[in-house]
Amino acid sequence: MPKRGRVGLAESFQSKTKKQKENEYNAFQREKMERALANNARAAPKSSGMTFRPLTVPVAGSVIYSRPRVPQVRTNQMSTFVVNTELVANITLAAAGAFSFTTQPLIPSFGSWLANIADLYSKWRWISCSVVYIPKCPTSTQGSVVMAIVYDAQDTVPTTRTQVSQCYQSITFPPYAGYGGASALNHKGSGGESLVSTLDTNRVDKRWYSTIGNAAFTALTSIDKNQFCPATAIIAGDGGPAAATAVGDIFMRYDIEFIEPVNPSINV
């Protein structure tokens, strides 16, 4: 004889269809996730979009550069790839605390070594490109430096450090910062003290850019420069010592792809 009366929980669960069981399980998981998200939202502080990290520096510091291995050059049937790091600019704070800035167009002809390879190809694109600041001044040096990458050559030049600090992914730091991040010169996985601005290759306008030399690029209008240059690094500073002071070096760490070989004598 079948049992009569209330059905137990186990029997009730067993009598449900597979679809009903899946629906109940999914509903339970959704409710669990919603509770977790609600708890996280209550716990997370409001953010302005700014991040910071404290800086501790020695009384004196410096960086020794060496090149234990050659730049990496590899090829396939269609492209040539080059990986390297090279010095591209020196940064000096203007006298009497005045504002000053340096621009570094992110094109291969502005790397003195890379430019010679770029002359051999018609087109190129960055696989990755980063600008690294390495200090060369004592920790007693006063002032502030800001570094950012802008993606429109038509933008006018900055006149204040505030303007540069408002750019996408800008970094502001004292001129003596960055000793501990020298490993960023060699690879992407650098320490927390590195001062690096990295090109966002998803934001560039074109897939490929035509090769152009320094002189020809400098002579272009700002509108035309956008056809040859995906972005420009800006390094600016103010509040420096009474006399103009060299405070750091700018290195470009890159992985670049070239296509369409061409005779350098006809490459502009």
Curated annotation (Swiss-Prot):
Location of the region described as R domain, interaction with RNA in the Swiss-Prot/TrEMBL record: 1-77
Keyword RNA-binding: yes
One GO CC term on file: T=3 icosahedral viral capsid
PROSITE patterns: ICOSAH_VIR_COAT_S
Superkingdom in the source lineage: Viruses
Primary localization: virion
Chain spans, region P domain, projecting: 259-268
Subcellular localization(s) per the UniProt record: Virion
One Gene Ontology molecular-function label: structural molecule activity
InterPro entries assigned: Capsid_prot_S-dom_vir, Viral_coat
Stretch list, region Disordered: 1-21
Pfam family, one: Viral_coat
Region of interest called S domain, virion shell, as start-end residue ranges on this chain: 78-258
Keywords: Capsid protein, RNA-binding, T=3 icosahedral capsid protein, Virion
Family per similarity comment: Belongs to the icosahedral plant coat protein family.
Function: Capsid protein self-assembles to form an icosahedral capsid with a T=3 symmetry, about 28 nm in diameter, and consisting of 180 capsid proteins.
Subunit structure: Homomultimer.
The protein, known as: Capsid protein
Species whose genome carries this gene: Tobacco necrosis virus (strain D) (TNV-D)
